[in-house]
Amino acid sequence: MASLGVNIDHIANVREARKTFEPDPVKMVLLAELGGADGITVHLREDRRHIQDRDLNLLKETVHTRLNLEMAATEEMTSIALNLKPDMVTLVPEKREEVTTEGGLDVIKNKNKLKEIIQRLSGEDIPVSLFVDPVQAQLENCAEVKAAWIELHTGKYAITKNKARDLELSILKENTAKAKSYGLRVNAGHGLTYQNVEPIAAIEGIEELNIGHTIISRALSVGLSQAVKEMKSLIINPRKDNFLL
């Protein structure tokens, strides 16, 4: 059974829209954990468009589950992670002009850089995950740079329908198995919703799903704890063929 990591970036987005003090994502974490979140995920972007350094420091002290820090593979972010010591670092690609992360890391192209960052973080007992597209060549290189984890990008699956979605689901299943055979542990996320999460949650070998936007959206209607609880129930008892379109 996969666990649930709740991404709280969109709470910070609302706060930063007015450059004020609320809603405070740090205060919302308790509600997410009460709803059943197994971990909390935040992305500290280089432009600080939502999560701020202040948030990270407070989250490190207040998260009772696990803190997963998503970040770009830069010297600035590596130094922050080494000082913070989150429970996990997930390295992601980052472009200032994008609304959200648009694709996986090119591990092949950035192999030496990623290997060096992974060595530094792992040396301080910080597990590192690489956010990658479900492509065999990328997975092979994830293993070669000594990443402990990967997070499979589910964005293409999330935006397709019918036979195209079935194909993307098969690709995710196949590459989860390949990643496991390379000694990698597997998470997944991006674009997952209450309507499409169950087939992904049912994939054998996926350990955690990182989900944010759909949970925060649902929370506007039912509250954050209930929104998390509803998502968790879908992940715990997934139906492999359940697509609610």
UniProtKB/Swiss-Prot annotation:
List of residues binding 3-amino-2-oxopropyl phosphate: N7, R18, G191, G212, H213
Matches recorded under CDD domains: PNPsynthase
GO biological process, one term: pyridoxine biosynthetic process
Enzyme class, broadest EC rank: transferase
Feature type site, description Transition state stabilizer: E151
Pathway, per record: Cofactor biosynthesis; pyridoxine 5'-phosphate biosynthesis; pyridoxine 5'-phosphate from D-erythrose 4-phosphate: step 5/5
Keywords noted in UniProt: Cytoplasm, Pyridoxine biosynthesis, Transferase
Pfam families: PdxJ
EC number: 2.6.99.2
Matching InterPro entries: Aldolase_TIM (IPR013785), PyrdxlP_synth_PdxJ (IPR004569), Pyridoxine-5'_phos_synth (IPR036130)
Active site: H43, E70, H190
Major localization class: cytoplasm
Cellular localisation: Cytoplasm
Top-level taxonomic group: Bacteria
UniProt xrefs under Gene3D superfamilies: Aldolase class I
Subunit and interaction comment: Homooctamer; tetramer of dimers.
Primary role: Catalyzes the complicated ring closure reaction between the two acyclic compounds 1-deoxy-D-xylulose-5-phosphate (DXP) and 3-amino-2-oxopropyl phosphate (1-amino-acetone-3-phosphate or AAP) to form pyridoxine 5'-phosphate (PNP) and inorganic phosphate.
Protein name: Pyridoxine 5'-phosphate synthase
Encoding gene per record: pdxJ
